[in-house]
């Protein structure tokens, strides 16, 4: 590790209050590919990082379905309407990036400091790419507990709040399997999803959207207004007001 990377690793260790050496099941490593989360062990998968410039997100950016994508319909994107969105469970930022690419201003909240650090690193590196920078400039990350932050919200509230809780059963793609196998031991399941929904419904001015596995029950709370369903997942939509141009 070069001096610059060693210095960055030490600073990150201090910021996250993590040991810089010793026994561990996971390590954060800093290098030419940015910040990576690596599981240790003989059968561990490869490192996990956030990359908005290359890989699946680049393909989706260049070849994706535009405003016809189900997530776009779920948050209310339509001609002349690009709602202000709060992604209350940002994770690795994939869905927020899609919405920002489509023109939405997206505020992201991620409560786990390691996941937030991976996301912040991905955003920082993506700003160096001239094609992706305009998208990233519409994404604004905050680390903290979404329920607390929403309950103490100051300023203009978001029109739409998007929630994607981590539940025991998720999509079966190889990418998601890898991500879940690494993230679940760190963050666990979102056992406070109903409280998250309650806070979101109080704050959002127009609608709340909850992403769920297609066959999973709805989050405990108010009745779902309507559902958009795909092959492996669905969006439960709780409308409050119509989004209009």
Curated annotation (Swiss-Prot):
It comes from the Bacteria. Specifically methylates the guanosine in position 1516 of 16S rRNA. S-adenosyl-L-methionine binds at residues 94-95, 110-111, 164. Keywords: Cytoplasm, Methyltransferase, rRNA processing, S-adenosyl-L-methionine, Transferase. One of its GO terms (cellular component) is cytoplasm. CDD domains: AdoMet_MTases. One of its GO terms (molecular function) is rRNA (guanine-N2-)-methyltransferase activity. HAMAP family: 16SrRNA_methyltr_J. Its EC number is 2.1.1.242. Pfam families: SAM_MT. It is found in: Cytoplasm. This is Ribosomal RNA small subunit methyltransferase J. It catalyses: guanosine(1516) in 16S rRNA + S-adenosyl-L-methionine = N(2)-methylguanosine(1516) in 16S rRNA + S-adenosyl-L-homocysteine + H(+). Belongs to the methyltransferase superfamily. RsmJ family.
């Amino acid at each position: 590790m070069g001096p610059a990377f060693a210095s960055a690793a030490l600073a990150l260790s201090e910021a996250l209050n993590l040991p810089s050496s010793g026994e561990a099941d996971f390590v954060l490593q800093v290098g030419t590919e940015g910040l990576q989360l690596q599981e240790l062990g003989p059968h561990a998968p490869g490192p996990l990082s956030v990359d908005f410039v290359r890989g699946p997100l680049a393909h989706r950016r260049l070849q994706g379905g535009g405003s016809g994508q189900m997530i776009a319909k779920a948050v209310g994107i339509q001609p002349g309407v690009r709602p202000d969105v709060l992604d209350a469970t940002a994770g690795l930022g994939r869905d927020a990036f899609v919405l920002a690419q489509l023109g939405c201003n997206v505020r992201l909240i991620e409560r786990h400091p390691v996941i937030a650090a991976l996301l912040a690193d991905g955003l920082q590196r993506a700003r160096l790419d001239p094609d992706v920078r305009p998208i990233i400039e519409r994404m604004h990350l905050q680390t903290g507990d979404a329920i607390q932050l929403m309950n103490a919200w100051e300023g203009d509230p978001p029109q739409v709040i998007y929630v994607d809780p981590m539940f025991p059963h998720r999509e079966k793609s190889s990418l998601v399997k890898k991500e879940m196998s690494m993230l679940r031991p760190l963050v666990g399941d979102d056992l406070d999803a109903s409280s998250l929904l309650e806070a979101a419904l109080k704050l959002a001015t127009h609608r709340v959207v909850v992403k769920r596995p297609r066959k999973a029950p709805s989050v405990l709370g108010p009745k779902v207004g309507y559902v958009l369903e795909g092959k492996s997942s669905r969006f439960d939509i709780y409308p409050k007001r119509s989004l209009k141009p």
